Amino acid sequence: MKRTGHSTFIQKYFLTTAIIILSHLLPTGSVLSDVSLPGIFGDGMVLQQGMKIPVWGKADPREKVTVSINGRTKSTKTKGDGTWMVKMKKMNAGGPYEMEVSGTNEIRFTDVMIGEVWVCSGQSNMNFRIRNLGDIPGQLGDADTPEIRMVTINTQKHEQPQDDFIREKPAWIPCSSQD
């Protein structure tokens, strides 16, 4: 026996009701995500003096992100893809400072210096430690200069461009006769 009128209406009613209920229960793609920054940012980092300082990362789309360092604050809203960037005003050499980045969460970096940033690259000799040269009278004892920092980015192979790298903790280490 074929029922078309009443049972078809009931099926459509229950199907529509189920879709409406599920649409309110399922995630909509807007999953809360903490504010994050690339691995180059970390405690003890050095930021370039004498130029606008770029700070960037990821968060929820259209989330307000605020960056503060040494009494200077700048805010932005993330783009639709969740990326964000602010350019802090120029700063002179100095520190140590704290840098806070906040959105749905807060990240705090300590011992931040403003100064000269040098980028060095090379082959395997870039990993050679001066202390391995042996006894260099007077050289290593004078190497305790904690204002000088170094970050090492490990070699990684990828088939596609990357927007971050995996770093070891701590990222930035001060210059010392022990390293």
Task: Cite the ranges covered by each PLM segment.
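Short linear, low-complexity motifs centered on an aromatic residue
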Residues: 1, 28-29
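Charged, low-complexity surface segments at secondary-structure and domain boundaries
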Residues: 1-2, 18-21, 133-135
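N-terminal secretory signal peptides that target proteins for export/translocation
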Residues: 1-11
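Bacterial N-terminal signal peptides
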Residues: 13-27
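Cell-envelope and extracellular/periplasmic
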Residues: 32-179
